[in-house]
């Protein structure tokens, strides 16, 4: 039986929007058409604060912004969510999984300032440019690399 006190890590889906049309993604079918059963929705910063209040944030070790049905960087409140969470519990570890194809280099530099070294962003890079273009349709390989470099520097 689940006991709330045992909760240590949380997997969050803060959006189900994505700029990519990856053929293996559940958001898409028949070669990239959007799945009509998945509605485009985002959590707001208020949703985040309500669900992950200070009691929850102080109990857990960390959380993952994952993109099973959307890419977390598409959510306009992502950086604010990260700031809020680390302000409440500075020992939290935040992990973000992304295709890395959205946003500008400046946005990525700002996110890097919000997330110091102990946090992690995982960029989905599927091979070199030719292979990447097959599996991450709607993203540009060179842009993903530029964004990753902007975040790292």
Predicted feature locations:
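Conserved alpha-helical substructure of the radical SAM core
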Residues: 1-120, 134-146
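Flexible loop/hinge segments that line or gate small-molecule binding clefts
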Residues: 128-130
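Short, intrinsically disordered, charge-balanced linker/junction segments flanking boundaries
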Residues: 148-153
């Amino acid at each position: 039986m689940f006991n709330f006190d045992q909760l240590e890590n949380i997997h969050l889906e803060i959006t189900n929007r994505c700029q990519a049309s990856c053929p293996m993604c559940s958001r898409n079918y028949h070669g990239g058409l959007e799945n009509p059963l998945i509605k485009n929705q985002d959590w707001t910063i208020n949703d985040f604060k309500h669900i992950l209040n200070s009691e929850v944030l102080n109990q857990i070790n960390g959380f993952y912004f994952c993109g099973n049905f959307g890419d977390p960087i598409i959510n306009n409140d992502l950086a604010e969510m990260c700031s809020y969470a680390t302000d409440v519990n500075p020992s939290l570890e935040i992990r973000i999984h992304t295709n890395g194809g959205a946003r500008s280099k400046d946005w990525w530099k700002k996110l890097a300032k919000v997330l110091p070294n102990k946090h992690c962003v995982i960029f989905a890079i599927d091979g070199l440019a030719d292979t990447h273009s097959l599996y991450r349709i709607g993203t540009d390989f060179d842009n993903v690399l530029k964004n990753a470099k902007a975040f790292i520097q």
